[in-house]
Amino acid sequence: LCDADYSQIELRVLASMANDKTMIDAFNSGDDIHTITAAQVFGLPVDMVTPVLRSRAKAVNFGIVYGIGAFSLSKDIGVSRAEADKYIKGYLATYTGVADYMEKVISKAKADGYVTTLFGRRRYLPELSSSNGMLRAFGERVARNAPIQGTAADIIKIAMVKVFERLKKELPDAKLILQVHDELLVECPERDAEKA
């Protein structure tokens, strides 16, 4: 079995969709995005970021993509709600493009009734006009998340088609057998492992 995966695809999609220069620079530097985020959010030099702080920054990075709030983040990483709120605010102050994107995507979703991926797929959001506040809040989380997750899914699907076609031409004994999140698994003879 051979595998290939996209490194932090959803965060990269977020950086692109939000056109967040700080996040794009962090990815382009080749450094670990979670360590960079921890350093920026907690105001530390990169070499002083501990594994615990990196783990908290990772939870914030991915939590933002999923529309996490302070209550859920506090439970996920074992800190007070006030501390979790401080982390989220620090993150959004660091990645101002992400903060702007989050506001704009919700406003647009409320006006249009849907959000789209970069490839044009729509996710309709009737929850945004609900009289139930919890449903509206859910709709806002989905409005922030669906374009990012959906675009990442679109990219993976396109990659699957391209890998399938290329394997068919170049390595007929190799088979694309599984997709797991941002990873593709190929079964092939050992002699073809490097090419696959």
Tell me what each language-model feature is.
Residues 1-196:
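Conserved catalytic core of nucleotide polymerization and phosphodiester-bond processing enzymes
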